Amino acid sequence: GEGKGYELTATMEMKTGGGEPRAYDVNVWHTKPDFYRVTVTEKNDNVTQMIVRNEEGVFVVTPALRKTYKFQSEWPKQNSQAYLIGGLAQDLVEDKAAVMTEKDGEYIFEAATRNADKTGLPSQRVVVDKETMLPKSVVIMDENQEEKIVIDFKKIDLKVAHKKEEYAVEKFSENEEDEVAAADIEDKELQTHYPTVQWENTKLIDEKVVQEDGMERVILTFEGDKAY
């Protein structure tokens, strides 16, 4: 029977320009129909960012910075998000030209992503376990077929359905008093491929690490319609 949701853990590696690849731990909750929580933690500096969809909308939470932004967004409907297994399945369904090969108990799909115009990453290779029919890994490539994002699924549990109360954003912020800043942007494309949220006409231009009360914090600077 169809479950009411899932929980999964994965690792994600992003290969940027010339630097070292960045490694992240990813944890996803999904409860049908529309509750999502994605937690992404950078392994080197332990900075965590969350994107949460609940009844009130879509929120991006950076617990350590005590910041929560609310978006007007259809996320994740419009996006290929490789760590959301429902979206991954949708990618495969929508790409009529997807090619499947079979090898060593695995199905390997070569398929298009659905938001290449925004990301510049048009294709992906999805490896599915033949027995469980669950994805084992996803590699997302640029137009030169160079690997840019690699996701390895460590554990996928289809029997977990978190209660909707568990998706309350207040739970994830380190300070109960926090106010939610509304990012009043009609957001066409909320992407959570860390380093951060990128929305229309806004891009991450700077990332500073500052020492504050002995704590290391990452300050993200945006440029665009809204500057924070």
Where is each model-derived feature located?
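N-terminal leader/targeting segments and the immediate start of mature chains
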Residues: 1-35, 45, 93-102, 178-184, ...
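Flexible, processing/modification-adjacent segments and terminal tails
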Residues: 54-122, 162, 176-193
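Short, solvent-exposed recognition patches
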Residues: 27, 175-228
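Short beta-strand segments that buttress and anchor functional surface loops
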Residues: 10-13, 37-41, 108-116, 138-141, ...
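An acidic-aromatic
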Residues: 27-82, 142-152
